[in-house]
C-alpha cells in the first residue's frame, strides 16, 4: 500500500480545495416520540386577547402571554424557554429562537405585545374602525332582526277578527295573547266595561278570573296592586267601583303603568263626571256601564294606543310646546287677551299636538293631565279631527273640577287664512302635525255664539299680522335636530323637561326613530332610565347605561330632567359632553321652548 495513503499529508494553508469532514448525523431514534415537544415554540407563542377601555373612552385590543407562555431570559437563565433538555448542541440550535431573547419580552400578565414600541401608534385601519364604530346608531342591531319582543311590534295594533266561528276561536284567542299590551276595565261586580282588544265574549272568562283575584285580596284588607307571571306584568288600579287592569310585556314600571291607568280613569270621568259615576253604582252595583260610555270607546282606544306606542308626555307628566320666539308668542297672547270674550275661562291655540299659547284666570291653571285628554280628543281620535270645522263639546276636566262640566268650543284653521277647515288635514294632503286649532273653554253652556265670535276675531287678527303663518311655518320645521343644536355630538335623541314649567322638549324623531318599532325601542330605553332614577329609595342624580344596542344617560336636578340615547360604542365621556351641550342650549332657548306664565287675566 502506498505510504501516502497511510500517512496523510499535513494540510497546507495554500490548499483551498480541502473541506473538513461533517460531524455524524444524529440518529432518528435519539428522541423518543413520546417526549417530543407538545408546547408551541417561542416563535409561535400561545397568547390571550384582552380588550381594554381607556379613560378617554377609546378601546384597544392587545395580545397578552398565555398561562403557558414564555418567561423572560432572566428567569430562564439565558436558555431557550419551553424546550426540552437535549444532549447535543445541534438540538439547542434548532429549538431556540431569536425571539426568545428579544428585549420586548414581558412577564406573564403584563399587557404588551412583541411590538411594544408600536403600542400607542394607531394605524389608519384602526382609526377607520374607530370612526365607523362611533357611527353605529342605537338599536341598529335590533333593526337587523334580533330575536326579541319588538320584532313583531308593527303588528301590535292589528285588529282581531270581529266575526269568527267556534273552530277559529282558539286562533283568535292566541292572537289576543300575542299582544304586548292589554288594558281592561271592569266593575267591582265583575261586569266587563271595556277592553282594548277582543270582544267581551272572547275575554269574559279572563275578566272573571281577574275580578276574583282582586276581590280575594280586597276581602283580606290588602288591595292587590300588581303581580308577575313570567315576563308579563299585571298592574291593577282600583277607583271606587271600577277596576283598571294593564297587562304589559314592555318592561314598564308599576308607577308608569298606574299613571296610564289613571289617565284612562280620567277619560271616563271626562264623559260622566265623578258624581254621576258614583250615583250609577250606588243604586245598582251590577250596572252595565257600557251604555253610558257608548261612543267613547274610540277615545279610550286612542289613549291606550298612545301609551303602547310610547308617549313622552305621559312618561314625564308634562306638555310639549311649539318652539317660537318670545316676541311672537307675546304677540299671540296679547291678541288673545285683547279680544277675550267675557265668559271665557281658558283659551288655547294648539298646533300638531303642541301648545302654542294659553290664556287663563290669574288663580287658575290647566293641569297637564287635563290637556292630555283634550289633545287626545283633538289629534289622536277620529271623532273631532275627522269632522273638521267647529265643534261644541261638554267635557269634564277632572284635575280642574271632577264634579261638573265645562263647555269647549273647538275650531280648526284652514291654512293661514284663518278660515275654518271644512275637512281634516289628511283629506287636504297635509300632515296632521300641521293642524292648527283654537280651543275656547267656558263654564256657560249658552256661550257658543259668543265664543264663536271671539274665534273669528282672533283668527282674523292673527292672519292679518302674519302670526298664523309663523305658527304654520314652525309646525313644518318641526322639532330641533341634534346636529343643529349640538354640532359634532354623538347623541342620537334626547328629552329635556323643565320642572318649574312642567313642560318638555325633545329632539326630532327623524330620520332614525320614525318607524313604529324603532320608536318603541327608544321609548323603552327612556322608560327604563326614568324608572331607575325615580325608583323608591333611589338617590341617583346621574345614571349612565350601557347595553348591546345603545348607550344612555339620565340626569336629574331640581331644575330639569334630562334623558338621552346614543350608539352602543359611544363612551361615557362623549355622551356626557354631548348632554352638556344640549342642556346649555335648552337653558339659552328656554323662553322659546317653553311657555312661561302665559297670558293672565
Swiss-Prot record:
GO terms for cellular component: fungal-type vacuole membrane; Mon1-Ccz1 complex; multivesicular body membrane. Residues 27-53 have a biased composition (Polar residues). Coiled coil: none annotated. The keyword Membrane applies. It is found in: Endosome, Multivesicular body membrane; Prevacuolar compartment membrane; Vacuole membrane. InterPro entries: FUZ/MON1/HPS1_longin_1, FUZ/MON1/HPS1_longin_2, FUZ/MON1/HPS1_longin_3, Mon1. It is a peripheral membrane protein. The keyword Lipid biosynthesis does not apply. Keywords: Autophagy, Endosome, Membrane, Protein transport, Transport, Vacuole. PANTHER family: SAND PROTEIN-RELATED, VACUOLAR FUSION PROTEIN MON1 HOMOLOG. In complex with CCZ1, is required for multiple vacuole delivery pathways including the cytoplasm to vacuole transport (Cvt), autophagy, pexophagy and endocytosis. The MON1-CCZ1 complex acts at the fusion of vesicles with the vacuole, through its regulation of the SNARE complex during the coordinated priming and docking stages of fusion, and particularly at the stage of tethering/docking. This is Vacuolar fusion protein MON1. It comes from Gibberella zeae (strain ATCC MYA-4620 / CBS 123657 / FGSC 9075 / NRRL 31084 / PH-1) (Wheat head blight fungus).
Amino acid at each position: 500500500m502506498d505510504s501516502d495513503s497511510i500517512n496523510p499529508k499535513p494540510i497546507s494553508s495554500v490548499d483551498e480545495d480541502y473541506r473538513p469532514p461533517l460531524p455524524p448525523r444524529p440518529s432518528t431514534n435519539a428522541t423518543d416520540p413520546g417526549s417530543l415537544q407538545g408546547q408551541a415554540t417561542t416563535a409561535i407563542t400561545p397568547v390571550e386577547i384582552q380588550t381594554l377601555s381607556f379613560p378617554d373612552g377609546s378601546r384597544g385590543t392587545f395580545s397578552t402571554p398565555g398561562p403557558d407562555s414564555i418567561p423572560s431570559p432572566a428567569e430562564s437563565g439565558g436558555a431557550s424557554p419551553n424546550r426540552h433538555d437535549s444532549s447535543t448542541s445541534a438540538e439547542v440550535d434548532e429549538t431556540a429562537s431569536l425571539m426568545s431573547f428579544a428585549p420586548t419580552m414581558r412577564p406573564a400578565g403584563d399587557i404588551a405585545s412583541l411590538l411594544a414600541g408600536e403600542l400607542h401608534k394607531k394605524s389608519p385601519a384602526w382609526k377607520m374602525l374607530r370612526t365607523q364604530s362611533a357611527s353605529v346608531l342605537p338599536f341598529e342591531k335590533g333593526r337587523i332582526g334580533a330575536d326579541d319582543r319588538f320584532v313583531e311590534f308593527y303588528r301590535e295594533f292589528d285588529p282581531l277578527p270581529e266575526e269568527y266561528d267556534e273552530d277559529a276561536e282558539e286562533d283568535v284567542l292566541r292572537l289576543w295573547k300575542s299582544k304586548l299590551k292589554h288594558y281592561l276595565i271592569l266593575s267591582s261586580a265583575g261586569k266587563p266595561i271595556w277592553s282594548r282588544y277582543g270582544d267581551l265574549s272572547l275575554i269574559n272568562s279572563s275578566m272573571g278570573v281577574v275580578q276574583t283575584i282582586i276581590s280575594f285580596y280586597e276581602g283580606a284588607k290588602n288591595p292587590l296592586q300588581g303581580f308577575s307571571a313570567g315576563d308579563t306584568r299585571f298592574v291593577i288600579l282600583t277607583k271606587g267601583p271600577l277596576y283598571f287592569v294593564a297587562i304589559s310585556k314592555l318592561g314598564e314600571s308599576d308607577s308608569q303603568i298606574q299613571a296610564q291607568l289613571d289617565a284612562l280613569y280620567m277619560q271616563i270621568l271626562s264623559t260622566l263626571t265623578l258624581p254621576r259615576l258614583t250615583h250609577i253604582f250606588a243604586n245598582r252595583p251590577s250596572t252595565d256601564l257600557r251604555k253610558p260610555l257608548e261612543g267613547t270607546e274610540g277615545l279610550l282606544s286612542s289613549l291606550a294606543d298612545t301609551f303602547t306606542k310610547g308617549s313622552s308626555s305621559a312618561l314625564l307628566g308634562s306638555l310639549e310646546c311649539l318652539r317660537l320666539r318670545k316676541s311672537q308668542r307675546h304677540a299671540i297672547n296679547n291678541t288673545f287677551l285683547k279680544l277675550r270674550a267675557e265668559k271665557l275661562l281658558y283659551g288655547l291655540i294648539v298646533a300638531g299636538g303642541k301648545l302654542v299659547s294659553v290664556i287663563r284666570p290669574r288663580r287658575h291653571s290647566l293641569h297637564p293631565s287635563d290637556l292630555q285628554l283634550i289633545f287626545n280628543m283633538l289629534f289622536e281620535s277620529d271623532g273631532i279631527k275627522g269632522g273638521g270645522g267647529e265643534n261644541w263639546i261638554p267635557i269634564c276636566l277632572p284635575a280642574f273640577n271632577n264634579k261638573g262640566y265645562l263647555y269647549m268650543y273647538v275650531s280648526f284653521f284652514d291654512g293661514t287664512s284663518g278660515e275654518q277647515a271644512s275637512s281634516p288635514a289628511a283629506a287636504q294632503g297635509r300632515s296632521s302635525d300641521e293642524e292648527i286649532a283654537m280651543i275656547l273653554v267656558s263654564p256657560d253652556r249658552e256661550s257658543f255664539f259668543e265664543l264663536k265670535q271671539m274665534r273669528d276675531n282672533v283668527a282674523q287678527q292673527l292672519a292679518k299680522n302674519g302670526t298664523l303663518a309663523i305658527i304654520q311655518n314652525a309646525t313644518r320645521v318641526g322639532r330641533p335636530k341634534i346636529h343643529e343644536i349640538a354640532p359634532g355630538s354623538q347623541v342620537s335623541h334626547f328629552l329635556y323637561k323643565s320642572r318649574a314649567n312642567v313642560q318638555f322638549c325633545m329632539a326630532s324623531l327623524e330620520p332614525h326613530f320614525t318607524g313604529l318599532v324603532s320608536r318603541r325601542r327608544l321609548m323603552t330605553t327612556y322608560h327604563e332610565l326614568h324608572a331607575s332614577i325615580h325608583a323608591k329609595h333611589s338617590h341617583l342624580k346621574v345614571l349612565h347605561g350601557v347595553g348591546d344596542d345603545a348607550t344612555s344617560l339620565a340626569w336629574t336636578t331640581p331644575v330639569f330632567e334630562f334623558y338621552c340615547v346614543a350608539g352602543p360604542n359611544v363612551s361615557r365621556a362623549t355622551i356626557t359632553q354631548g348632554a352638556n351641550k344640549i342642556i346649555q342650549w335648552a337653558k339659552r332657548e328656554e323662553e322659546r321652548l317653553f311657555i312661561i306664565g302665559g297670558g293672565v287675566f
